[in-house]
Amino acid sequence: MTDEIKAPTPIELDYTAKAGTPLAKDAKRATHEDIIGALKSVQDPELMLNVFDLGLIYKIDQKENGDVDIVMTLTSPTCPMGEEMIQMAAQAVSSVVGVGVVTVNLTFDPPWTTDMLSEEIKLMMGI
């Protein structure tokens, strides 16, 4: 009898995480910098680097009503913490004052590469 090693299961390509509640009509909206700051608080648990500087955030779309739509990727489709990281990003941004409902959509198009790292992280890693 041999022990069979199974490959990690890829995360669903259409995975979406949501968090937050709608803003009141007269509420002041958060700044783009506040949203980026929240994303920088979310770390990839394997690399211990934040998702923004890793280049995992492809798009931030801040709506007039305070809702925020984010397109995010992972370093690998088989990332064991992928769903949790996407949910953590949604929760972090939704905790910012002036943000309503946050939707984080997963994509692997284009696939992530080290070219997407911030310059600071590239220098730190010697890339």
Q: How would you label these PLM feature ranges?
A:
Residues 1-127:
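Domain-level signature for proteins that mediate thiol-based redox and metal-cofactor handling
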